[in-house]
UniProtKB/Swiss-Prot annotation:
GO terms for cellular component: cytosol. Mn(2+) binds at D14, H202, H204, N238. One of its GO terms (biological process) is L-leucine biosynthetic process. Its EC number is 2.3.3.13. Homodimer. It catalyses: 3-methyl-2-oxobutanoate + acetyl-CoA + H2O = (2S)-2-isopropylmalate + CoA + H(+). Its cofactor is Mn(2+). The gene is leuA. This is 2-isopropylmalate synthase. It holds the Pfam family LeuA_dimer. SUPFAM superfamilies: 2-isopropylmalate synthase LeuA, allosteric (dimerisation) domain, Aldolase.
Length: 523
């Protein structure tokens, strides 16, 4: 009988470290709910002691996610563990994940300590975490470069202290699969109490071996795999969860393990993470790339037509990528749009039907037929722009030509007031941005601009993603329209609203802090 491999997602903690702009609490919650639908067993959603914003996002997710265990990261530091527990206490059940470096290099140069002191600290902090929860994970940072005898000592001590999961990270992506499997096997041979804990692995992709190392570890006895959707993460990224999950499913014959993942949600979750994090998926990415199930060779095409299994070891449908359907038009009613969203697996809580239908009608009037990918794009944009808006694009027009200076006129609703400005620029998009900057006086600096076609052919929607710098912080904005300049303008307005909301959140946090301080003085 096969054993279950626990899937531990760290998209919102380790994965977020790779992003050019931090995610909002709402965006993190949206990803967390998608991960919950996909069936991840554990989700690590932040490092609460690092900032009030991270604390709030962990607390918000812990309050709303019910079917996956929510986890927060903490160093082997008392305050880290206490703050993590405070952020998680609203959850029905939670995990605290604490870590300390164990390799000779890290102990000597980073911690300026000794192995004995590290073990003593690990024992104390695991016990402290156990005061808050019976689910404690302990990580040996840089385990891949830790001598097996030293690693075994740390692991045995952490388990004796109460750790229920022991994580073995290849922190710098250094080990080879056969080496990593040897580390796991070595621990099973050397640690007498190893049956009292789940052995987990956390691999990085610096040498392109993260997935291979994780699978080798599973084959050697690891029963939890940590990673991020689409493999996002600092440097070369984390282990791609979707790749590990599908490898376990497809090669169950030799691995003899399974996961509790709802495979039909993989595609949609991957796309959502890509869009919210503003990290496009390469076409040749395994499992979720746009070319993952494409066949251009004549020999391959012929073979697939005769029997898909000739060249496909899994089907698009197995990850929730269904065939494109069409024929929604401006004559289609709300019920038809809702029915199609239901068929694509969307719950009513994931989109606002009134807003979606209004956007659908406008798009249908422009392009005639509306496809599944159009609906998904409209639903995504609508979800991103549900929050209160201070700025709204009221009107814009541009004039440009091959030998002319581009000029733009823009009207922007700023709260209750509508303001208008005109500006020249290096092309129509730049002219629009210059006009918007004049209206708001925010002096936003564009750092990154990308355009993605949502759909096929000349009627495809254009999605613009931008990253902008304001007062030393980076903000992400997204816009969608059939017109590229309009998409660009909407993306900048989205950035402005994100800046405004961030300022409002900061004011609220300061108000709460002052309130707490006043209460202390009263006591």
């Amino acid at each position: 009988m096969s054993q279950q491999v626990i899937i531990f997602d760290t998209t919102l903690r380790d994965g977020e470290q790779a992003l050019q702009a931090s995610l909002s609490v709402k965006e993190k919650l949206q990803i967390a709910l998608a991960l919950e639908r996909m069936g991840v067993d554990v989700m690590e959603v932040g490092f609460p002691v690092s900032s009030p914003g991270d604390f709030e996002s962990v607390q918000t997710i812990a309050r709303q996610v019910k079917n996956s265990r929510v986890c927060a990261l903490a160093r082997c530091v008392e305050k880290d563990i206490d703050v993590a527990a405070e952020s998680l206490k609203v959850a029905e059940a939670f995990r605290i994940h604490t870590f300390i470096a164990t390799s000779p290099m890290h102990i000597a140069t980073k911690l300026r300590s000794t192995l004995d002191e590290v073990i003593e600290r690990a024992i104390y902090m695991v016990k402290r975490a156990r005061n808050y929860t019976d689910d404690v994970e302990f990580s040996c940072e840089d385990a891949g470069r830790t001598p097996i005898a030293d690693l075994a000592r740390v692991v045995e001590a952490a388990i004796n202290a109460g750790a229920t999961t022991i994580n073995i990270p290849d922190t710098v992506g250094y080990t080879m699969p056969f080496e990593f499997a040897g580390i796991i096997s070595g621990l099973y041979e050397r640690v007498p109490n190893i049956d009292k804990a789940i052995i987990s692995v956390h691999t990085h992709d610096d040498l392109g071996l993260a997935v291979g190392n994780s699978l080798a570890a599973v084959h050697a006895g690891a029963r939890q795999v940590e990673g991020a959707m689409n493999g996002i993460g600092e440097r070369a990224g984390n282990c791609s969860l979707e790749e590990v999950i599908m490898a376990i499913k497809v090669r169950k014959d030799i691995l003899n393990v399974h996961t509790a993942i709802n495979h039909q949600e993989i595609w949609r979750t991957s796309q959502l993470v890509s869009q919210i994090c503003n990290m496009p998926i390469p076409a040749n990415k395994a499992i979720v790339g746009s070319g993952a199930f494409a066949h251009s060779s004549g020999i391959h095409q012929d073979g697939v037509l005769k029997n898909r299994e000739n060249y496909e070891i899994m089907t698009p449908e197995s990850i929730g990528l269904n065939q494109i359907q069409l024929n929604l038009t401006s004559r289609s009613g709300r019920a038809a749009v809702k029915h199609r969203m239901d068929e694509m697996g969307y719950k009513e809580s994931e989109y606002n039907l009134d807003n979606l239908y209004d956007a659908f009608l406008k798009l249908a009037d422009k392009k005639g037929q509306v496809f599944d990918y159009d609906l998904e794009a409209l639903a995504f944009i609508g979800k991103q722009q549900e929050e209160p808006e201070h700025f709204r694009l009221d009107y814009f027009s541009v004039q440009s030509g091959s030998n002319d200076i581009a000029t733009a006129a823009v009207k922007l609703a700023c709260g209750e007031e509508v303001k208008a400005e005109a500006a020249n620029g290096n092309g129509p998009v730049d002219a629009v941005y210059q006009a918007i900057n004049r209206i708001t006086d925010y002096n936003v600096e564009l750092v990154k601009y990308s355009l993605t076609a949502k759909g096929h052919g000349k009627d495809a929607l254009g999605q613009v993603d931008i990253v902008a710098n304001y007062n030393g912080r980076r903000f992400h904005g997204v816009g969608l329209a059939t017109d590229i300049v309009e998409s660009s303008a909407k993306a900048m307005v989205h950035v402005l609203n994100n800046i405004w909301r961030a300022a409002e959140v900061e004011k609220e946090l300061q108000r709460k802090a002052q309130h707490n301080e006043n209460n202390k003085e009263t006591v």
